[in-house]
Protein backbone atom coordinates (compact mmCIF):
# COMPACT_ATOMS: atom_id res chain seq x y z
CA UNK A 1 0.00 0.00 0.00
CA UNK A 2 1.35 3.41 -1.01
CA UNK A 3 2.36 5.51 2.00
CA UNK A 4 2.22 9.30 1.93
CA UNK A 5 4.72 11.68 3.52
CA UNK A 6 5.69 15.33 3.11
CA UNK A 7 7.83 18.17 4.43
CA UNK A 8 6.29 21.55 5.24
CA UNK A 9 8.17 24.83 5.54
CA UNK A 10 8.58 28.28 4.03
CA UNK A 11 10.66 28.50 1.90
CA UNK A 12 10.52 24.86 0.82
CA UNK A 13 11.62 24.65 -2.85
CA UNK A 14 15.26 23.99 -1.86
CA UNK A 15 14.45 21.00 0.38
CA UNK A 16 16.37 17.78 -0.28
CA UNK A 17 14.03 15.73 1.93
CA UNK A 18 11.96 14.26 -0.96
CA UNK A 19 15.14 13.06 -2.70
CA UNK A 20 16.50 11.54 0.52
CA UNK A 21 13.26 9.74 1.43
CA UNK A 22 12.80 8.38 -2.10
CA UNK A 23 16.30 6.88 -1.88
CA UNK A 24 15.41 5.37 1.50
CA UNK A 25 12.24 3.94 -0.09
CA UNK A 26 14.16 2.30 -2.94
CA UNK A 27 16.67 0.84 -0.51
CA UNK A 28 14.01 -0.60 1.83
CA UNK A 29 11.48 -1.49 -0.91
CA UNK A 30 8.74 0.60 0.68
CA UNK A 31 6.29 2.25 -1.71
CA UNK A 32 5.78 5.89 -0.82
CA UNK A 33 5.34 9.40 -2.11
CA UNK A 34 7.04 12.32 -0.37
CA UNK A 35 5.92 15.84 -1.26
CA UNK A 36 6.87 19.43 -0.46
CA UNK A 37 4.21 21.64 1.11
CA UNK A 38 4.68 25.40 1.15
CA UNK A 39 3.68 26.49 4.63
CA UNK A 40 1.11 29.22 5.10
CA UNK A 41 1.76 31.40 8.17
CA UNK A 42 -1.97 31.94 8.69
CA UNK A 43 -3.24 28.43 7.90
CA UNK A 44 -0.34 26.26 9.14
CA UNK A 45 -2.36 24.38 11.76
CA UNK A 46 -5.12 23.72 9.22
CA UNK A 47 -2.53 22.45 6.73
CA UNK A 48 -1.33 19.90 9.30
CA UNK A 49 -4.87 18.78 10.04
CA UNK A 50 -5.74 18.49 6.35
CA UNK A 51 -2.63 16.43 5.62
CA UNK A 52 -3.53 13.75 8.15
CA UNK A 53 -7.26 13.83 7.34
CA UNK A 54 -6.22 13.04 3.75
CA UNK A 55 -4.47 9.86 4.96
CA UNK A 56 -0.97 11.28 5.35
CA UNK A 57 1.32 8.90 7.25
CA UNK A 58 4.05 11.26 8.41
CA UNK A 59 5.11 14.87 8.13
CA UNK A 60 8.48 16.58 8.50
CA UNK A 61 8.45 20.19 9.65
CA UNK A 62 11.18 22.70 8.88
CA UNK A 63 11.70 26.44 9.36
CA UNK A 64 9.89 28.48 10.53
CA UNK A 65 7.23 26.11 11.91
CA UNK A 66 9.00 23.74 14.32
CA UNK A 67 7.72 25.53 17.42
CA UNK A 68 4.13 25.63 16.14
CA UNK A 69 4.32 21.92 15.27
CA UNK A 70 5.51 21.20 18.81
CA UNK A 71 2.62 23.16 20.32
CA UNK A 72 0.10 21.41 18.07
CA UNK A 73 1.10 17.89 19.14
CA UNK A 74 -0.77 16.07 21.90
CA UNK A 75 2.01 13.57 22.68
CA UNK A 76 5.74 14.37 22.52
CA UNK A 77 8.83 12.24 23.00
CA UNK A 78 11.26 13.13 25.79
CA UNK A 79 13.85 14.52 23.39
CA UNK A 80 11.15 16.56 21.66
CA UNK A 81 9.97 18.01 24.98
CA UNK A 82 13.53 18.96 25.92
CA UNK A 83 14.14 20.55 22.53
CA UNK A 84 10.90 22.53 22.69
CA UNK A 85 10.46 22.17 18.93
CA UNK A 86 9.32 19.34 16.64
CA UNK A 87 10.42 18.27 13.17
CA UNK A 88 8.58 14.93 12.86
CA UNK A 89 4.82 14.37 13.16
CA UNK A 90 2.55 11.34 12.85
CA UNK A 91 -0.89 10.18 13.97
CA UNK A 92 -1.30 7.30 16.38
CA UNK A 93 -4.61 6.28 17.98
CA UNK A 94 -6.15 9.51 16.64
CA UNK A 95 -3.62 11.69 18.46
CA UNK A 96 -0.90 13.84 16.92
CA UNK A 97 2.57 12.69 18.01
CA UNK A 98 5.76 14.73 17.73
CA UNK A 99 9.47 13.99 17.86
CA UNK A 100 12.67 15.91 17.20
CA UNK A 101 15.26 13.92 15.26
CA UNK A 102 17.73 16.79 14.73
CA UNK A 103 19.81 16.01 17.81
CA UNK A 104 20.27 12.30 17.12
CA UNK A 105 20.98 13.19 13.48
CA UNK A 106 23.80 15.48 14.58
CA UNK A 107 25.30 12.92 16.96
CA UNK A 108 25.30 10.18 14.32
CA UNK A 109 26.96 12.44 11.76
CA UNK A 110 29.55 13.75 14.22
CA UNK A 111 30.45 10.16 15.15
CA UNK A 112 31.92 9.82 11.65
CA UNK A 113 34.56 12.36 12.59
CA UNK A 114 35.29 12.31 16.33
CA UNK A 115 34.45 10.82 19.72
CA UNK A 116 32.48 13.30 21.87
CA UNK A 117 33.19 11.80 25.29
CA UNK A 118 35.48 14.00 27.43
CA UNK A 119 35.66 16.67 24.71
CA UNK A 120 35.33 20.42 25.21
CA UNK A 121 32.46 21.57 22.97
CA UNK A 122 31.43 25.10 22.01
CA UNK A 123 27.99 25.86 20.53
CA UNK A 124 27.63 29.21 18.77
CA UNK A 125 24.10 30.58 19.18
CA UNK A 126 21.37 30.09 21.77
CA UNK A 127 18.25 29.85 19.63
CA UNK A 128 16.03 26.92 18.72
CA UNK A 129 18.74 25.12 16.75
CA UNK A 130 21.06 25.14 19.77
CA UNK A 131 18.31 24.06 22.14
CA UNK A 132 17.51 21.08 19.95
CA UNK A 133 21.03 19.63 20.15
CA UNK A 134 22.07 20.28 23.79
CA UNK A 135 20.41 17.22 25.36
CA UNK A 136 21.88 14.65 22.94
CA UNK A 137 25.30 16.32 23.21
CA UNK A 138 25.15 16.10 27.02
CA UNK A 139 24.20 12.42 26.72
CA UNK A 140 27.52 11.90 24.89
CA UNK A 141 29.30 12.93 28.14
CA UNK A 142 31.57 15.77 26.98
CA UNK A 143 34.07 17.24 29.42
CA UNK A 144 32.42 20.64 29.03
CA UNK A 145 29.62 22.10 26.92
CA UNK A 146 29.70 25.86 26.46
CA UNK A 147 27.04 27.95 24.72
CA UNK A 148 28.14 31.33 23.40
CA UNK A 149 25.70 33.96 22.23
CA UNK A 150 25.81 37.62 21.27
CA UNK A 151 23.41 38.43 24.11
CA UNK A 152 24.20 36.58 27.32
CA UNK A 153 20.58 36.75 28.50
CA UNK A 154 19.42 34.27 25.85
CA UNK A 155 22.22 31.86 26.74
CA UNK A 156 21.27 32.15 30.42
CA UNK A 157 17.74 31.02 29.51
CA UNK A 158 19.22 27.79 28.15
CA UNK A 159 21.30 27.33 31.30
CA UNK A 160 18.15 27.45 33.40
CA UNK A 161 16.84 24.47 31.43
CA UNK A 162 20.21 22.70 31.15
CA UNK A 163 22.21 23.53 34.33
CA UNK A 164 25.12 21.34 33.17
CA UNK A 165 26.14 23.80 30.44
CA UNK A 166 28.33 26.88 30.73
CA UNK A 167 27.42 30.11 28.96
CA UNK A 168 29.44 33.04 27.68
CA UNK A 169 29.36 35.87 25.15
CA UNK A 170 31.23 35.76 21.83
CA UNK A 171 33.66 38.34 23.19
CA UNK A 172 34.69 36.29 26.23
CA UNK A 173 35.37 32.81 24.87
CA UNK A 174 37.75 30.49 26.71
CA UNK A 175 40.93 29.73 24.82
CA UNK A 176 40.44 26.32 23.22
CA UNK A 177 37.91 23.68 22.21
CA UNK A 178 37.88 20.24 20.62
CA UNK A 179 34.66 20.93 18.69
CA UNK A 180 32.88 24.12 17.60
CA UNK A 181 29.28 23.84 16.35
CA UNK A 182 27.70 26.77 14.53
CA UNK A 183 24.02 26.85 15.51
CA UNK A 184 23.48 30.47 14.43
CA UNK A 185 21.59 31.39 11.27
CA UNK A 186 24.54 33.43 9.97
CA UNK A 187 25.49 30.91 7.26
CA UNK A 188 22.01 31.14 5.77
CA UNK A 189 22.77 34.76 4.84
CA UNK A 190 26.39 33.93 3.91
CA UNK A 191 27.79 35.62 7.02
CA UNK A 192 30.02 34.40 9.84
CA UNK A 193 30.33 35.08 13.55
CA UNK A 194 33.85 36.46 13.97
CA UNK A 195 35.64 34.55 16.74
CA UNK A 196 38.84 35.42 18.59
CA UNK A 197 41.89 33.81 16.91
CA UNK A 198 42.49 31.83 20.10
CA UNK A 199 39.31 29.84 19.48
CA UNK A 200 41.06 28.11 16.57
CA UNK A 201 44.43 27.72 18.32
CA UNK A 202 43.75 24.09 19.31
CA UNK A 203 42.56 23.31 15.73
CA UNK A 204 39.06 22.21 16.81
CA UNK A 205 36.84 20.21 14.50
CA UNK A 206 34.19 22.65 13.21
CA UNK A 207 30.62 21.77 12.26
CA UNK A 208 27.95 23.98 10.68
CA UNK A 209 24.34 22.94 11.24
CA UNK A 210 23.52 24.72 7.97
CA UNK A 211 24.44 23.11 4.66
CA UNK A 212 25.02 24.10 1.07
CA UNK A 213 25.01 21.23 -1.41
CA UNK A 214 26.96 23.10 -4.09
CA UNK A 215 29.63 24.99 -2.13
CA UNK A 216 31.02 25.42 1.38
CA UNK A 217 28.97 27.43 3.88
CA UNK A 218 30.48 30.68 5.10
CA UNK A 219 31.29 29.15 8.51
CA UNK A 220 32.94 26.06 7.00
CA UNK A 221 35.12 28.25 4.80
CA UNK A 222 35.94 30.54 7.74
CA UNK A 223 37.00 27.57 9.88
CA UNK A 224 39.11 26.06 7.09
CA UNK A 225 40.80 29.41 6.60
CA UNK A 226 41.68 29.19 10.29
CA UNK A 227 43.40 25.85 9.69
CA UNK A 228 40.60 23.63 11.00
CA UNK A 229 38.85 20.60 9.56
CA UNK A 230 35.21 21.58 8.97
CA UNK A 231 32.01 20.11 7.50
CA UNK A 232 28.47 21.34 6.96
CA UNK A 233 25.18 19.85 8.15
CA UNK A 234 24.26 17.78 5.10
CA UNK A 235 25.12 14.59 6.99
CA UNK A 236 22.91 15.69 9.87
CA UNK A 237 20.07 16.26 7.39
CA UNK A 238 20.41 12.71 6.08
CA UNK A 239 20.70 11.17 9.56
CA UNK A 240 17.70 13.03 11.00
CA UNK A 241 15.72 11.96 7.92
CA UNK A 242 16.72 8.33 8.54
CA UNK A 243 15.47 8.54 12.12
CA UNK A 244 12.14 10.02 10.96
CA UNK A 245 11.87 7.28 8.31
CA UNK A 246 12.42 4.69 11.06
CA UNK A 247 9.74 6.24 13.28
CA UNK A 248 7.19 6.11 10.48
CA UNK A 249 8.11 2.82 8.78
CA UNK A 250 9.85 0.78 11.53
CA UNK A 251 12.82 0.19 9.20
CA UNK A 252 16.18 1.94 9.64
CA UNK A 253 17.73 2.82 6.27
CA UNK A 254 21.46 2.92 5.58
CA UNK A 255 22.77 6.46 5.14
CA UNK A 256 26.40 6.34 3.99
CA UNK A 257 25.85 5.78 0.26
CA UNK A 258 23.03 8.31 0.16
CA UNK A 259 25.24 10.94 1.77
CA UNK A 260 28.03 10.15 -0.69
CA UNK A 261 25.54 10.49 -3.55
CA UNK A 262 24.35 13.91 -2.35
CA UNK A 263 27.94 15.09 -1.83
CA UNK A 264 28.85 14.08 -5.40
CA UNK A 265 26.76 16.81 -7.05
From Swiss-Prot:
Pathway where this protein functions:
Metabolic intermediate biosynthesis; chorismate biosynthesis; chorismate from D-erythrose 4-phosphate and phosphoenolpyruvate: step 4/7
Q: Which residues form the active site?
A: 66 (proton acceptor)
Q: What class of enzyme is it?
A: oxidoreductase
EC numbers: 1.1.1.25
Gene Ontology biological process terms in this record = amino acid biosynthetic process; aromatic amino acid family biosynthetic process; chorismate biosynthetic process; shikimate metabolic process
Write out the catalysed reaction.
shikimate + NADP(+) = 3-dehydroshikimate + NADPH + H(+)
- Oligomer status and interactors: Homodimer.
NCBIfam families named in the record: aroE, PRK00258.1-2
Q: What is this protein's record name?
A: Shikimate dehydrogenase (NADP(+))
* Source organism (scientific name): Legionella pneumophila (strain Corby)
This protein's gene is called aroE
Amino acid sequence: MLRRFAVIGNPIAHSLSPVIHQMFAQQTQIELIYEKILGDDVKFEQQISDFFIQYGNGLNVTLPYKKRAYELAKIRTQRCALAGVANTLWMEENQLHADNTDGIGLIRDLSRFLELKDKKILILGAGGAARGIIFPLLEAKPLKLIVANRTLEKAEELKRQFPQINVTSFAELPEFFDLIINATSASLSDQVIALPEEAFSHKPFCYDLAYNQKTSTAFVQYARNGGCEAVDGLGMLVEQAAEAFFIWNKVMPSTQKILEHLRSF
